[in-house]
């Protein structure tokens, strides 16, 4: 089962453009409150974490991912590192800060891929199971991605304090 999701978000930041860029580039601060990102670690330009994903019929699984952090003039991007194995995730994103009438706006493009190997199925029952697992996984990841802007927005609003 492989599910690929791409989403775009616009998230308010209470600070000016420079403060929002600093926030965005600090992965611990900007992504630390996203509920499905666990065990977030940053070493140099390498970001590692676990993606908490509800896998059909297996429950919640922690799929590790690794991305490379790259700065650009108006923000930062995460470049996904290819993975292998029976279960994996990749996370990529590009955040750009723009001025707003009050504070700043972060435009974020998020791309997540999740892969979980299921036992090979050659009979019609197994094929039906695969289709059901694929549909269930797609719905679960859709729900999961709704948490992303909420988590980043909560972290951004905490900057007011």
Predicted segments — roles?
Residues 10-16, 52-56, 70-72, 98, ...:
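Solvent-exposed residues in well-ordered beta-strands and their adjoining turns
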